Amino acid sequence: MNTITVYEHSNFQGLHKTFTSDVPNLVNESFNDCISSVKIVGQPWILHQDINYSGQCLPLEEGEYSGISMNDGASSLRLITDDLSNPQITVYEHVNGGGKALVLTEETNLAFGNMHDNISSHRVQRGAWALYEHINRGGRCIVARAGEYLANYCTIGFNDQVSHVYPLRAGKTSVTATILWDRKKVESERNVQIDQYFYTNNTSIEQQFTATSTKEFEKYVSHSFEFSNETSIKVGTSFTLKGVVDINTEVSNTFTVKKGETESFTTRKKAELSMPVKAPPRSKLTVNFMCKEITISVPVELKIVRGSKTDIETGTYRCESGTETYIDVQSLPIS
């Protein structure tokens, strides 16, 4: 959800309101010319000095702003809905796209080149851009959005005045993971002997006893997540897998994945192996304490939201567990 919360006073004090879409006239919201601090989640917003998105503007990206330069001066708000993932703008020396052309894909201080205060038109291929009057994002600015072609800066009083160009950035990437359990696969399954116990019943009566392992045993569950080779998710992005196995209850739990940092973990729990056994009359028993180890893999659908753009990727959740214990009893008669 893309939101802007505006506050009457600095430091997020006083009356406040939250908006999720464009506001052409803050008078109608009883919040005109009174915004002093702002909190933004998701895509950037543009604060405009006049109604209907006109006058001076102030672009703000995701974050908390305890004070703003347009203090008590905003009359309209606009949400940037463009895809901001791969920005590109071409600026031109003359009107109508004439003269020298400069293609930009990142923030640029024009004072370091030959286009400083020498731009008269632009065309935006992708993203949304803020073009500033002074270096270091200072002075007046205009906002240019994807698909826009502004042929003559003279019409807006901005000819030969651009010194700094900045591509607006989307907020943090949101990832929602869904484990597709109906497509679960068992990759491997094996039975492992933990301990062995011997018992002899020399009587003519069936005997019942409790077999207890003398070895320490640990139940374990290992979880891992594997991203696809083509993933667009960047290092540091985190999301939660719900419904994974918990070692204590052996039911659903959660696993938080953080790309490049936490993509696997293992839990262990000591367990005492003690099970009832019946020994037939005049028999020798071999009691094998066993553990079933199983590895499963399950596809995971990842819904990735970057501002107004949504992508779907797949990954793999893998779980290796050794929590199921049992006994295998072999009986031989004795004479």
UniProtKB/Swiss-Prot annotation:
The organism's place on the tree of life at top rank: Eukaryota
Domain Beta/gamma crystallin 'Greek key': 2-42, 43-81, 87-126, 127-169
Family annotation (Pfam families): Crystall, ETX_MTX2
GO BP field: lens development in camera-type eye; visual perception
Record's keyword terms, sorted: Repeat
Coiled coil regions, renumbered to chain: none
Tissue: Epidermis specific.
GO MF, one example: structural constituent of eye lens
Entry-linked CDD domains: PFM_EP37-like
Record note on domains: Has a two-domain beta-structure, folded into four very similar Greek key motifs.
Family: Belongs to the beta/gamma-crystallin family.
Protein name stated in the entry: Epidermal differentiation-specific protein
